[in-house]
Amino acid sequence: MSKQQEHNKPISDRIKIAVYGGNGFVGTRVAEALVDRGVCAACLSRSGHKPLHLKDQKWSETARWCKGDASDPDTQLLERMDGLVTLVGSPPLPTFSKQAYDQQVFVNGTTNAIAIQRAGEAGIKRIVVVGAQIPFFMRRESFGYAKGKNIALQAAEDFSKLSSEHRAVVLQPGMIYGRRYLESGKAIPLDKIFKPFSWLMPWQFVSVEKV
């Protein structure tokens, strides 16, 4: 079916996708791509607010901006969805305390795993998990970010084994760079800093514009 045909459908008949982390740096790009294809995207975040820097972007008026916590998903909402995209995470920073380590594991792993499990219980049969391509020297249990991503990966694998109809796609891009925005809407041009690295190591750096 063409994008135009999907756009012409009434909202009640469109494909509905829940996006946990949908108001974040990468999540907003995913939501935009879904809306562009005529999908009804429910962007879930703890605030439930549309980011200020999107206020003048037409596509953002079509997406649904909802309050939701991936670590405590709304099962009734998921039951109305046809698919799930989960990309909750935090930067791959080193940790120097058990509390910080546990938080890295929870945000990057446990949170996504809970969302995936609840999606299966809600009857969803298609999910997409956005992970990360982690350099070899960082793939160790002592690095909370890597351990968390592995937990999410295992949850996706378990989901795909629920039945022959269940499908899980795991995307593991390199470092995604681009212009970030503060809650105030102010832009931080990190794209100018990381773009030269993408020329030197294109396999490790991905522009958010290509998401």
Whereabouts are the PLM-identified features?
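Structural motif
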Residues: 16, 82-83, 126
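Glycine-rich "substrate-gating" loop/helix at the edge of Rossmann-like oxidoreductase active sites
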Residues: 102-103, 141, 198-206
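NAD(P)H-binding glycine-rich loop region in Rossmannoid oxidoreductase-like domains
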Residues: 49-50, 56-114, 118-121
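Substrate-positioning beta->alpha
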Residues: 111-112, 202-211
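Flexible, glycine-rich beta-alpha linker
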Residues: 140, 166-195
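Conserved Rossmann-fold NAD(P)-dependent oxidoreductase catalytic core, especially the SDR/UDP-sugar
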Residues: 40-47, 98-152, 162-169
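N-terminal Rossmann NAD(P)H-binding glycine-rich loop of SDR-like oxidoreductase domains
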Residues: 10-37
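Active-site segment of SDR-like NAD(P)-dependent oxidoreductases
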Residues: 91, 131-135, 174-177
